[in-house]
Amino acid sequence: MSTLKKCFSTVAFSALLLGGTLSAQEPDFDLSAQRSEIQTVAPVPGCRLDHGGIVINPTPQQMGIDSTQRLDISRGLCLKDPAGCFAEDVDFVKLADKGPRLEILFGAKRAARQGVKPVSGAYRLTVDARGVTITGYDECGAFYGLQTLRQLIASPASAGGRIPHVTVNDYPDLPSRGVVEGFYGTPWSHEVRMSLIDFYGRFKLNTYIYGPKDDPYHSCPNWRKPYPEQEAMQIRELVDACRRNRVDFVWAIHPGQDIRWNEEDYRNLVGKFERMYELGVRSFAIFFDDISGEGTDPERQVALLNRLTEEFVRAKGDVAPLVVCPTDYSRLWANPTPQGSLSIYGRKLDPSVRVFWTGDVVCSDLTPETLEWVDSRICRPAYFWWNYPVTDYARHIMLQGPVYGLDTTLTAQQVCGIASNPMEHGEASKLALYGVADYAWNVEAYNALDNWERGLGELIPEAREAYRTFAIHSADTESGYRRDESWETRTFRLDEWTAPAAAALRAEFERVEQAPAILEARCTNRALLGELRPWLEEFARLGARGLRALDLMEAFRAGADDAAFWPQYEANLMSAAERRSYEAHRSGTMKLQPFYQQAMDDMGYGWMERMLGRKPMTLRGIGSFASAHTLQTRQMFDNDSTTYYTSGISQKPGDWIGVDLGGVHGVGEVLVLQGRNSTKDVDYFDHAVLEYSVDGRQWSPLLDELDKQYVVRWTGSPVEARYVRLRCLDSKRTNHVAIRSFEINPLHADRLSARLSGPDAGDESRLPYAFDERLDTSLPLSGTLELSVRPGTEQYTLLMGGLDAPVRIEQLSADGEVLKRDETGNSFFRFAVAKGTATLRVTGDVEIFEVIAR
């Protein structure tokens, strides 16, 4: 018998079970008027550029190219390194005793004569007939000049070892550019960290902040303890790798949850810093984020930071200024008054200490407005902690889209740096970090789309197009921080079908289905492939079911015979196991999977209307949150109390979550399960009203003034309604909202004129799924289903699946006589009711999707 389809427990066929904007057929419902905020997904800015065969990242500030003149380096370059600093950094070029020179110089005076900007990391690179000359403002600048040369040599324009003459005058816009390993979840392996550090150096990122939330020696209760020998050795290796790549290794500590504001813990903290100093660490950060209790006191935080600055940083002489992540790191909950912690920082914190800031919310864009707000309070340019591409709040997503949402008018006087918080998938985070490096170096010139196109070729040049196919459909978070996805793909509903649109979409689904195999065969970065593989496997399945959905749509539009249509339709339904696998590793969430789901729903709705002779009820999630308009709302209807829809952003009075029934129906029972559980969860409306409406404009209460209720149940005389919702009333709660179940008129097994016998006897909880008028639910039968035949019933249709052996159908009289017996091996079976039949009996090992009486 095949894997069971997912079981549900409401009385509606979910033809439109997915959350989304209302269809054009319902223009009278003003959904936007019911929403608490405008929800948009900003498009990716920029355009793809022709770089003439020269690809340099980050984009240089100034670059002149003379492609008519070439320097032949095929026989090697003669290294001139008077400072003796770069012998290990020129492994990308052949060296020779004679020939064109590669001269590497640095120093403020030399740089000034060459017109190099007097900032750390600035350099001038010249390629002419005499050879290559790099002049850095400092050693770091000269190293960056080498990284530009490395990319120039690797560019298509330099094929055959003949480099075009160029002049590059370059410098970084932001002083601090890098990564904060600050996510929750599985920390990176040592090998991944080492790989990433090389990546940082190659693309001119100069900061790596080591602060894994799940490193026990970084946070409480073990922050006071030294690292064990093996872990300490790895820290030293990371420090050495950073030094080779001219990256500042910043070791962060997270002591706030259990710190005691006394001399003993101050000494514990200094002692830990001393041990890290012995391992080579010369930069330190203290995180006071995500804590409660005494550790949140900003006065004590400032006193600690100032004392450490004086007694440790300045006393050492070779330690960089401290970095702090405040408790109020987001405007969402920061106290804006002069008594707030940020204002206290501004008045009392040593000016050398850099202060992290995540923006208006935890995951948000970098804008002049958010910087003006925070800078005016902390009295210094903020250090932007960008929570992208981190997915610790959405681990089912692999973010591979463009880097955007970073304002291109900002200067170092507004923001002192940017630190990207990546995914726990370090190799797969490189695509986003490629963009962060580009932005932070040359802010005004940053072109998000072009950078992404270049980054794809950098990471997987041997299978760039296949990687692009996956990446463009694996970009949205489905949460509060939405990202554009599938922007080149046009999908459509069943009633919008055109042959050209279907052909274009078919071609895309074919690329989707084929891309994983191409990547598996060609990608040489096996570590990256290993991180992507679970998503790629699901991506191939998504492509296959999208293609089958297109085939089904064509057959449905052509008026396919019912008996021929159903087996194909049933075969393309996702099983419970398939859905769980997809939910764990989602892609195509903005367009591709919704297309599949809507196509199946639209066909199923139209087909069931034909089967029933009337319009069935539908269930579709709606609400005031952006995530209420994605497939996530299906979690409210999946009959699984361990899954839930989540708003993904904070709630406020007036917000709501509800159900669209697709038309006006009698509603006599509503059951809502709030929260991720029904015990002590905080993600729920603690003050709410349950309402219904016919038109979406005028609402009437079913249950008013609900106070701290996880389980919301209403039964009563049926009311006419199309919409039912749970709306937040006045409340100080700012948590997310989670809904595990939103049931309308649920069927109850004990009220059905049907029973199970054989192995299934005694467990009739799934019995309603054979009668709920939904094609995405099913009754797994291993025995006999017996049901009473209503007077006047002339015909039955059985919709089945997973037939490994014939199913027996018997019609019995009131006294138990078998009037007719049939056997079928077909999943679609329609038969007439014999005269005098009182009971129908179905026996076999089969999935019953629906028993339809006419």
Predicted regions and their residues:
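Bacterial N-terminal signal peptides
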Residues: 10-19
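Disordered, acidic Ser/Thr/Pro-rich linker "stalks" and the adjacent N-terminal cap
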Residues: 604, 609-667, 673-688, 696, ...
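Acidic, contiguous N-terminal accessory segments
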Residues: 24-129, 135-137, 158-168
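C-terminal functional modules
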Residues: 31-35, 56, 448-618
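Short beta-strand-plus-loop segments that form exposed binding edges in beta-rich domains
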Residues: 726-734, 841-847
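Catalytic-core regions of glycoside hydrolase
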Residues: 138, 154, 182-183, 278-282, ...
